[in-house]
């Protein structure tokens, strides 16, 4: 007997929601456990700009007394307004290899979205409007790097059999360029910088608001209008993203290019902290 339950910020149920992932992947040596406390805080809305943009709901499916599936559903009102759509989203999908459990779960989530006026659903997206947990892994092997999705190989089958269709493919690449190539690119970049008169500076974390304004300006001019699922983040969201990333780095790997003081490009690189998170088993400290 399957039963779906919905909830918002109940800590006990949120812990069950988060811990299901640990049960699902406990025998998978490549899985990287998320930090339990941070994940629960994010699901309560702390430092989560997506939850500020509209309603959301968590769903669990029980088979008897056992939790066998979960999903987060919600609405990004800012995105819908910008695109002129009525679209809901789902995120953090986890499910046993059981088509009926998937059906009960997604029926509950889709009905809730329909009841609040949505006529379409997309996912899985990031639960905090970031780049983590997007999509399902359909090809690849080994431990994922930071921010890359890692999911069960049968998830695409479950979600397609339920009735969703594939929207697009995302790819992640790995490379280790030879030293000669690095040196050549350095020379080319120095030449281009002098010829075209632009500067490249590291992010100044002491001026994070001003730096975020420049990054916001770049994003406003570079995000394509035809990406239905993506809207330019607000200034507050950009600032919050950098505040969140501060736990991983100090700004050393972020650069902003400017020409005559006007921002024209930026890039963010992160160390692969999954190498560390893997050994922490979801906890910053051994006792909690």
Where do the protein language model's features map onto the residues?
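Generic start-of-chain signal for non-secretory N-termini
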Residues: 1-30
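A conserved beta-strand-loop-helix scaffold within acyl/acetyltransferase catalytic domains
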Residues: 21-64, 71-81, 202-288
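A structural signal for short, well-ordered beta-strand segments and their strand-loop junctions
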Residues: 120-126, 167-174, 256
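Flexible glycine/acidic-rich beta-alpha junction loops that bind and position SAM and/or redox cofactors
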Residues: 127-135, 176, 271-278
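Acyl-donor binding region in acyl/amide transferases
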Residues: 81-163, 230, 283-288
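An acidic- and aromatic-residue-enriched active-site/binding cleft used to recognize and process polar
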Residues: 74-78, 93-95, 126-128, 178, ...
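Acyltransferase donor/substrate-recognition loop-hinge adjacent to the catalytic core
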Residues: 2, 149-229
